[in-house]
Amino acid sequence: MSETNGGNAARENSEVKQTAVENPIDKLDGTPKRPREKDQDEQAEETSDKSEAPNKNDEEKKEEGKKDQEPSHKKIKVDDGKTVESGIVEDDKKEDKFVFGAASKFGTGFGVAKKDTKDGDATTSTESLPASDSKTKKPFAFGSGLSFGSGFNILKNKTENNSESEKKATDVDKDKVHSGSEQLANASEDTKDKPKPLKLQKQEVKSGEESEECIYQVNAKLYQLSNIKEGWKERGVGIIKINKSKDDVEKTRIVMRSRGILKVILNIQLVKGFTVQKGFTGSLQSEKFIRLLAVDDNGDPAQYAIKTGKKETTDELYNIIVKSVPK
């Protein structure tokens, strides 16, 4: 009990002290204000009054604007017998704006089609199109309303003409193929009718040396001198032979044929008094030459020079010719 009494007494003392402290502050609030502070308070009140006035004016203007925005919808009768609000009609008139090129021919090529949206349904209006176009609508074609738009039709006509020409060409080709096949068939029949070529038989070609015996032969080159003004001329290259007759031992001749075509370029019969000489004064290789005096094909006197590849072969040829000359 004593403790509780002591606690209550302490609380009462603290409350008394607080009131003692608060009272002087309240007294300070009641002190008179300075003249400068009064002027500031008056100015603040005036500004607050002014701000409230324009706010009221703004609210009034907003309300007037809303009234102006509200459409004055009046019902108007249309030709179809339906009633439409006048505000909607005015809005539709406002939507019809000027389109660049709508009155020209070029503008019609793009198809002037307007879309009227009413109650969520989309309908196309044909106000600017003539009556004939509204009845029969043609598919849109770029440049159809222009003066040069007919160029596309010309191309179309050309394609049709081309298709016709192609058909004609195919028909002509078929005719050609048919005629060609007929020609081939006729040609095959002609070949069957033609007689077959005869088979050729091999025949023996006689050179005139069959009844002779070759004593000596060697490769050589032949030169001929018929006219001193013309000089020596080369007759050809081939094999020179010394042939002796099988029937008559005393008959011997010198035969030379050109290589390849086997043409006779030298044919001399060895007789009494036939002369053979060694060497050739006009050549640096005179030891490889031998010379013969005889008569040419025309019966005129001529001189022949025979050249071999080696000196030894030239000596052998010379010795055999000298021995074969009849005495």
Swiss-Prot record:
Main localisation: nucleus
Subcellular localization, as worded in the UniProt entry: Nucleus
Keywords: GTPase activation, Nucleus, Phosphoprotein, Protein transport, Transport
An example Gene Ontology molecular-function term: GTPase activator activity
Note: Present with 3620 molecules/cell in log phase SD medium.
Gene Ontology BP term (one): protein export from nucleus
Sites bearing Phosphothreonine, chain numbering: T31
Regions of compositional bias (Basic and acidic residues) in chain numbering: 24-83, 157-179, 189-205
Low complexity bias (residue ranges): 140-152
GO cellular component: cytosol; nucleus
Region annotation Disordered: where it falls in the sequence: 1-96, 109-205
UniProt protein name: Ran-specific GTPase-activating protein 2
Gene name linked to the record: YRB2
Modified residues (Phosphoserine): S179
Domain RanBD1, residue spans: 191-327
Compositional bias (Polar residues): 122-133
Subunit description: Interacts with GSP1, XPO1 and SRM1.
Pfam families tied to this protein: Ran_BP1
Top-level taxonomic group: Eukaryota
Functional description taken from the UniProt entry: Important for the export of protein containing nuclear export signal (NES) out of the nucleus. Stimulates the GTPase activity of GSP1.
Comment on protein domains: Contains X-F-X-F-G repeats.
Lineage: Eukaryota, Fungi, Dikarya, Ascomycota, Saccharomycotina
